[in-house]
Amino acid sequence: LQSEKLGSLNDRQREVLRDMQSSGKRLQQFIQDFLTYSALETGGLKMQFAAGNINECLSDVCRLWSTRFQEKGLALYFLANDKLPVFPFDSPKLERVISNLLENSFKFVPRGGTVWLHAEPHMWERRAAAQPASAGERRRQDTSQPNAVKVSVSDTGPGIPAEYQQEVFDDFFRLPGTESHEGMGLGLAIVRRLVQGMGGKIWVESDPGAGCKFSFLIPFKPVPSAAGKGKTR
């Protein structure tokens, strides 16, 4: 109908069709969130690790979001980091993590704002972290070498008060005063579970009125042999 192949439309009809399309996309997103959440809750969502280039993965997600950001008047920046090695990760799950974080910024950053996506090698001092090393994962002997990738999504949005910076990752949690925004409070909860499923951890740094910076770590895994590629856990 929107192509007007069946006849011309007036402005009101175009507006109604746009609203219908937007509602359909929201419903599709809600269904996807519920299915992902349910699979994570029941342990039915398995991680599938394969060696890949994380720069390509992040760039692909940015391309998918670029049009929507432009339409809202937001700037989205990603600069590939050539210091990142090829290592095994679950590309579809990582894409979902990044997409959810970008969607979160998209919802709350006002027109004229900016969002940055950045990734870099990182030395994860697990003994100082709240989350223990996952079973079977060996620490590198040379602790001076990066053992993880740190991915960050920063924005110029309204920020998150300190008292809610842990709760934002809880199931169905929504910040007070954000009820008018789309969503059910599952996006960041799904992000947390997916990151933890990849052996990582996630946190947010923010000051009210000064934007947000969501960061997560994913440990480097050894590149599997030909016989072990595509192994799930």
What are these regions (language model features)?
Residues 22-27:
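Short alpha-helical segment of the dimerization/phosphotransfer core of two-component systems
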Residues 187, 191:
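Short alpha-helical Gxxx[C/S/T] motif in the catalytic ATP-binding
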Residues 105-106:
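Short helix-loop "hinge" at the ATP-lid/N-box region of the Bergerat-fold HATPase_c
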